[in-house]
Amino acid sequence: TFHTRKTNELQIAIVDEAHRLRKKSGMFQNQGEDQIKEIINASIFSVFFIDRNQRVTFNDAGTIDKIRNFAQEQNSLIYEGVLESQFRCNGSDGYLAWLDNVLQIAETANYDGFEGDYDFKIFDNPHEMYDAIKAKNKINNKSRVLAGYCWDWPKEGRMTSLVKDIQIPEHNFGISWNLGNSDTYAIDPDSINEAGCIHTTQGLEFEYVGVIIGDDLRYENGKLIVDINKRAKTDQSIKGIKKLLKENPEEAQQIANEIVKNTYRTLMTRGQKGCYIYCTNKELSNYFKLAYNHQLSYTYNEPQVILSEQPLAADKTNSNIDKLNLKLDK
């Protein structure tokens, strides 16, 4: 943390994953000022690496606009650049662009598929996906199963993979969340018996990943549905959204939409050579199949978010945009 640093105390500060910066420092986020402001103040030269599509918790507060604003407040010179090349997902820019479009994170030209040798598969049975990942993992222990945070992670049983936290009853499938010693998840051979969550696997890379997409992302009546209610009660990443909903519904809907979609984008880009997916929602699985097999018509639209069971009193936007159902329990 930088809240105790003096002005220009550091020659240079290099901040990776700057999108994960918080509004304040400390365990309870109650110390100092905004972390971006503190870093700029404490450093003669600050470098921020940021990916706006990797915001996965309510408390992630790092944005390009905030960096610009705080830098301007301190009369700093601002230099902006874009990292054009990337090595993630076998260097497949096409896969990343396609994924952004199919998740409706960004409008790209790859709405109907992608070129290249990235190994992407959609499974109708979680057992079959798991078997495929285990077969890959036998080669060099570099493949893992990951999952959206739609299943609780109770304190009891966190140190044994015999407790199957993630249950898909229709397939009689179960797997435990990653154990409490998550620091070794990427290298421990026993981790193949566990499913990694977003908080454990963000920043990690494997050769192959199998991703279980839960009911917080569905496809219904031709619409992508984001449903925060389907997130686990033990998920701290959405803590604060209900309060914000009362204060600023528009901002709450935007953040909820980002968290769910960015979570799956992050999980689905952890595999260097391939990504296999299983969707608990069959319609979403079919949607992915159509998009992957070049059979999906161009339907990208900016999302509208419905925050309750009742329709909005007055729709002042174009009504032909996607509806993302973010129903929040009381």
Where are the regions a protein language model picked out?
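Structural alpha-beta junctions
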Residues: 69-80, 165-178, 295-303, 310
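C-terminal accessory regions
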Residues: 45-47, 191-300
